[in-house]
Amino acid sequence: MKKTFEHISVYVILLLLVTKISFAQSTEVITASKSEIIQTPCAGSTQLQGVDPAWMVMINHKPIKHPTTDQDQELVDRIKAEKQLLRQELLNSIPTPEPEALQAIPVKGTNFQGNANSGWTPLDNSVAISNGGFIVSVTNSNIKMYNTSGTSLYTNTLAGFVNISTITSAFDPHVLYDNVSNRFILVTLSGTTPTTSRLIVCFSKTSNPVTGGWWVYNINGDVLSNSKWFDYPKIAVTNGELFISGNMFSNLNIFDQSVILQLNKTQGYSGASMSSVTWSNITGAPGSILPIGHGHGSSY
């Protein structure tokens, strides 16, 4: 595994570019603390059995209204107004394109009802489509699969999909299609305390996410073993690895730091024990890091 992780500095720089909002060259050195290589055994596999939506159990947490005071609301409104003003100024600065430069109006193909809001706010919707025409759509907190004609092939809750007895609810799902490996990857979370936080990573066994089955990994969300829980995951793949970023919070829901997990996706596709490292204490203490997958030299 040493060779797998020796070029991490390149990936970390790519992962952190989104926080710079600049395309100028920089000599800034970005550093991070690297954990030991961790081996996570596969928690099992799941063979999909759909659930009739009329009987699909949905568990929603009681909402907490924010902000809690008029002063807080005034501050939020002022920030929104300032952002809207900056956005409009940016739009006004963009020159109007010449008529010949305008692109042709896209033609709508198949149109069908998608994965509806299950009552969570925010919706946290994510969708991926394969070269073979399979569509995997996730929201808080359900999953649906279709073909490109709009035929529903599978419906379930996220907890029902991962099929782990200790997981009764899941949230913050993200799904992507890995066009190099012709597989799907789905990541979701469970638990909002250091002792209950779980990071669930699922790999489709074949190119068919409906009938081919999935490998499921149940990772401790307290990734640094310092009594923090994992939130706001974002994902990306390279030729050999899966990157998952997330924000760590204390038991009092106070932000601690953002971290990056680097996992061996090839092992995940085979259901083997999966190697991973965690990167923390990143230069500049960025928050809400968005991983960037590099180009694969092929297209959808």
Q: What spans do the regions from the language model cover?
A:
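Bacterial Sec-dependent N-terminal signal peptides
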Residues: 1-28
